[in-house]
Regions:
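Short alpha-helical "recognition helix" segments of helix-turn-helix
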Residues: 13, 23-33
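Gly/Ser/Thr-rich loops at beta-strand to alpha-helix junctions
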Residues: 113-123, 213-215, 283-286
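Short Lys/Arg-enriched helix C-cap and helix-to-coil transition segments
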Residues: 50-65
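Ligand-binding beta-strand-loop-alpha-helix segment within the catalytic cores
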Residues: 67, 72-109, 133-217, 222-228, ...
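Alpha-helical DNA-recognition elements
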Residues: 44
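Key DNA-contacting residues within the recognition helix of helix-turn-helix
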Residues: 39-41
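Short, amphipathic alpha-helical "recognition" segments used to contact nucleic acids or chromatin
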Residues: 5-21
Length: 293
């Protein structure tokens, strides 16, 4: 009996092979698996009727958009999902379900996975499929901002993902996301336990990041870490939004060095060096920062 994960992988590979005309070697490289495994999955797809069902039901517009994005940007993979435009909650649910299945196909044994927080990622974590992979570790890559008026679901995301991946190696940062001064943050990072956790987080090979627009809807504003004047100043500097609490402009450069020096999060330069960086958006407000990140 095929698992949901294998069924989804067969669908994706069948689509790339039969509809996008990729070779088995190209597909193997994209998914970091062997070419014989691709061949076996294609055979399984035929035997299970996946090829017929998937090709007949696939949204042609979404597939065209995916191929255009892959041609234009240096992406390993992309998935475009059709959602209703008149129901934001349903759109988020559909996107989160598809994203969870899509992202899970890239996880491997011994991965060290860093994950951000926020309601969008929390929704994805709720739908994440169960995987049995050896020696998986999870790390929160931004400090907390939970208070009485704002929740970022950081602990819940780590707990849910730890359950789905069957690992007890799941670690949170029990510290604020933003401090009053860089000196306080520097002193905290000298604590042996915090330092060890921070250094382990830096070694993550795959990151699931959060994106936010540069407006009053972002968590840092709603939780009181930054005010309207801070937002206004960053927007004057060309801010298009934030990735893991780093506010950037259209060229991907930091907009507020002072704020960044007080922020407990995986550094922007480290983030960009990772081989795998996962993100998903469900609203047009986050597209500018996705483009610039």
């Amino acid at each position: 009996m095929k698992t949901d994960l294998n069924m989804e992988l067969m669908k994706n590979i069948a689509d790339l092979y039969y509809n996008s005309n990729l070779t088995q070697s190209e597909i193997a490289h994209r998914y970091n698996i062997s070419r014989p495994k691709v061949s076996r999955l294609l055979a399984d797809a035929r035997e299970n009727g996946i090829v017929k069902i998937f090709i007949d039901g696939r949204n042609e517009i979404s597939r065209f958009q995916e191929e255009q994005l892959l041609k234009r940007f240096p992406l390993k993979a992309v998935k475009v999902i059709s959602v209703p435009h008149d129901d934001d909650q349903l759109a988020l649910q559909i996107t989160a379900q598809e994203t969870a299945r899509f992202f899970s196909g890239f996880f491997r044994p011994h991965d060290r996975i860093g994950i951000s927080w926020g309601y969008t990622l929390y929704t994805m974590a709720r739908y994440f499929p169960e995987l049995s992979l050896d020696d998986i570790s999870l790390y929160q890559i931004i400090g907390h901002i939970d208070n009485t008026s704002t929740r970022n679901h950081a602990s819940e995301i780590i707990d849910l993902m730890g359950q789905r991946l069957h690992t007890q190696n799941a670690f949170i940062f029990p510290c604020p996301a933003v401090f009053d001064s860089p000196l306080i943050l520097e002193m905290l990072l000298h604590d042996s336990k915090v330092k060890k956790l921070y250094e382990s987080m830096l070694q993550c090979n795959k990151l699931i990041v959060s994106l936010a627009p540069s407006d009053t809807s972002c968590c840092l504003y709603r939780s009181g870490y930054i005010n309207y004047s801070d937002l206004d100043l960053m927007n004057q500097c060309g801010s298009v939004g934030s990735i893991c609490c780093h506010f950037i402009d259209q060229k991907g450069k930091l907009c507020d060095e002072g704020l960044d020096q007080r922020t407990l999060a995986i550094p922007l330069d480290v983030l960009r060096e990772k081989e795998y960086l996962f993100a998903y958006v469900t609203s047009s407000e986050k597209v500018p920062v996705l483009y610039s990140a």
